[in-house]
């Protein structure tokens, strides 16, 4: 990757980007019919794709990204976030100016007022909800929702949805048999693995005892049996809950090296304080602390990219629904006037099946 902001003299466009466009090689070949490329960077592909196709370039991008493109001639800013919001993108308006960043604290550093949202915190503590896709836990600070883009100039701000998850799901052709469904799923999984492992930096694997990461490890081993992968897994020393025995059994069938990352009560407390400072908003419990420790260990050892089962839990719908949890204990600890600020978001119901609406609630 090149230094950012990235400027393309041919198109007059400037880019800042966080993420990866997995099919950038294919897009480069297609765009070479119309442009001369001066580098081998993804950034140049993104800018020339936007110059050629405008907003519709997003439909051609296969990847995870948060991008901002400034057109010097038109004096307009275009921002977009990937289909499922893997990469964060926050923004705020102040005195007619638009501020944006991949972390909320960067907006505060730029002078945006730092004021917690009482309504959002009340909703979180009473209903265990993070609110609507555009909300944050800070007043007048917003996130661009997954699958949305934004146009901004000196006189207007226009936010639009470019990817509609429910329509994409409903347009998928249903396989005629279990065999066909299995073959199609494996084909898509293999394509995803090949794209993600095509990196110019050291790649490792984050392994738990779950079905998702175990499946991915098996798939990676089938595709790349002799690559020098380093596998990371965390444990706490509790034989009744640790998954380390399963990970060791899995890896006994491979040539991959296992790096075990231990968690102790002292480490958990230290990570909790650190992650609270980093995240700017509530995080998803103990697993976030464990992964933070695991990621920092991998980074110290020179492993820059870690593959894991992120996304497969959603595909297989194996998460519990937080709305089913008993909130009575928490509510009894809150003042009545604070609880009155809480509101349960009215989420969309695009599917006929209510189970589907609950399963994919965070994706639209």
Residue positions per predicted region:
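Cysteine-centered catalytic environments shared across enzyme families
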Residues: 1-280, 291
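Glycine-rich active-site loop/lid subdomains used to bind and stabilize high-energy intermediates
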Residues: 94-95, 154, 248-364
């Amino acid at each position: 990757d090149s230094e950012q902001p990235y400027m393309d003299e041919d198109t007059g466009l400037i880019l800042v980007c966080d993420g990866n466009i997995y099919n950038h090689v294919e897009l480069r070949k297609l765009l070479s019919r119309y442009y001369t490329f001066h580098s081998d960077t993804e950034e140049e592909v993104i800018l020339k794709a936007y110059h050629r196709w405008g907003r519709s370039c997003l439909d051609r991008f296969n990847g995870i990204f948060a991008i901002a493109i400034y057109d010097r001639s038109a004096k307009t800013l275009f921002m977009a976030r990937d289909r499922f919001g893997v990469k964060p993108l926050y923004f705020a308006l102040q005195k007619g100016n638009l501020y944006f960043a991949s972390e909320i604290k960067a907006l505060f550093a730029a002078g945006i007022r730092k004021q917690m949202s009482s309504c959002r915190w009340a909703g979180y503590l009473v209903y265990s909800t993070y609110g609507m896709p555009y909300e944050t836990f800070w007043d007048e600070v917003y996130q661009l929702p997954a699958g949305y883009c934004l146009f901004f100039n000196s006189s207007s701000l226009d936010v639009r949805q470019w990817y509609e998850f429910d329509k994409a799901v409903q347009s998928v052709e249903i396989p005629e048999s279990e065999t066909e469904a299995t073959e199609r799923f494996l084909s898509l999984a293999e394509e995803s693995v090949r794209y993600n492992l095509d990196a110019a930096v050291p790649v490792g694997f984050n392994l738990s005892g779950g079905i998702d990461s175990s499946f991915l490890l098996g798939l990676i081993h089938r595709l790349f049996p002799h690559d020098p992968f380093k596998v990371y897994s965390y444990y706490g020393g509790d034989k009744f809950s640790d998954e380390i025995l399963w990970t060791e059994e899995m890896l006994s069938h491979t040539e991959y090296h296992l790096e075990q990352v231990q968690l102790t009560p002292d480490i958990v407390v230290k990570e909790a304080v650190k992650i609270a400072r980093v995240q700017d908003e509530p995080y998803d419990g103990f697993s976030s602390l464990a992964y933070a420790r695991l990621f920092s260990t991998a980074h110290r050892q020179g492993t820059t990219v870690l593959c894991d089962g992120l996304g497969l839990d959603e595909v297989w719908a194996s998460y519990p629904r937080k709305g089913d949890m008993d909130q009575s204990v928490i509510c009894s600890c809150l003042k009545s006037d604070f609880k009155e600020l809480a509101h349960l978001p009215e989420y969309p119901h695009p599917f006929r099946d209510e189970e589907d609406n609950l399963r994919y609630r965070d994706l639209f």
